[in-house]
């Protein structure tokens, strides 16, 4: 498929041929869903924790005698049945990560790129070189281009001035091609890829 290439000042800069096997697939929600779940599960801290019976700070002394009180038989006040007692089978710190085949993850990335291309939310830039790393300059360019929530993917290395300018700009994320992932692509309304980024992604996913 053919895509128009523009510059940061919105002027045309020719066109580029995009690989249909990467940018021209029919997006499948089930594949995207599985990859996003894998990403978010891996990112989850898993630090949830509660105090169990052995963790609660109470005496282990039997609270009252076994027989003759008319009440139920109890031992320690740490039992889950009591207020401030330990929690029975509560959450403990653990990893939520699960495995997902490397080929499936690559397929998910292809479908994410294709979903932006098919909906017209993929823009190819010639490059993201800026003379100065000024946020005001980039903010003006982004406003004129009509970008609201945008992810910019560059080649192997991100232009230093562009990275500095975008760092303090709300709604603009910048990633190198190796950092391109399904979740970040779907999270933003517009996907912007430089020509160097397109070449790097096609080399990575072929």
Curated annotation (Swiss-Prot):
Coiled coil region boundaries: none
Alphabetical list of InterPro entries matching this protein: Ribosomal_uL4, Ribosomal_uL4-like, Ribosomal_uL4_dom_sf
Keyword Ribonucleoprotein: yes
SUPFAM superfamilies assigned to the protein according to its UniProt record, in alphabetical order: Ribosomal protein L4
Keyword terms: Ribonucleoprotein, Ribosomal protein, RNA-binding, rRNA-binding
A GO molecular-function descriptor: rRNA binding
A Gene Ontology term for the protein's cellular component: ribonucleoprotein complex
GO biological process: translation
Keyword Lyase: no
Disulphide bridges, residue numbers: none
Family (UniProt): Belongs to the universal ribosomal protein uL4 family.
Subunit (UniProt): Part of the 50S ribosomal subunit.
NCBIfam families given in the database record: rplD_bact
Function: One of the primary rRNA binding proteins, this protein initially binds near the 5'-end of the 23S rRNA. It is important during the early stages of 50S assembly. It makes multiple contacts with different domains of the 23S rRNA in the assembled 50S subunit and ribosome.
Stated name of the protein: Large ribosomal subunit protein uL4
Organism of provenance: Cereibacter sphaeroides (strain ATCC 17023 / DSM 158 / JCM 6121 / CCUG 31486 / LMG 2827 / NBRC 12203 / NCIMB 8253 / ATH 2.4.1.)
Source species taxonomy: Bacteria, Pseudomonadati, Pseudomonadota, Alphaproteobacteria, Rhodobacterales
């Amino acid at each position: 498929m053919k895509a128009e290439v523009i510059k940061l000042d919105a002027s045309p800069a020719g066109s580029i041929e995009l690989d249909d096997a990467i940018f021209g697939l029919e997006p499948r929600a089930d594949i995207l869903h599985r990859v996003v779940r894998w990403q978010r599960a891996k990112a989850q801290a898993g630090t949830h924790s509660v105090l169990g019976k052995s963790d609660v700070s109470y005496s282990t002394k039997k609270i009252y005698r076994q027989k003759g009180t008319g009440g139920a038989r109890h031992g320690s006040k740490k039992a889950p049945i009591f207020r401030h007692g330990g929690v029975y089978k509560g959450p403990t710190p653990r990893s939520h990560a699960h495995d997902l085949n490397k080929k499936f993850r690559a397929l998910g990335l292809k479908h994410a790129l294709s979903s932006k291309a098919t909906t017209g939310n993929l823009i190819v830039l010639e490059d993201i070189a800026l003379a100065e790393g000024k946020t005001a300059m980039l903010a003006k360019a982004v406003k004129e281009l009509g970008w609201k929530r945008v992810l910019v993917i560059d080649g192997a290395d991100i232009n230093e001035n562009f990275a500095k300018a975008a760092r303090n700009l709300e709604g603009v994320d910048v990633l190198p091609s190796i950092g391109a992932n399904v979740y970040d692509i779907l999270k933003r309304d517009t996907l912007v890829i430089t020509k160097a980024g397109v070449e790097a992604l096609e080399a990575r996913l072929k």
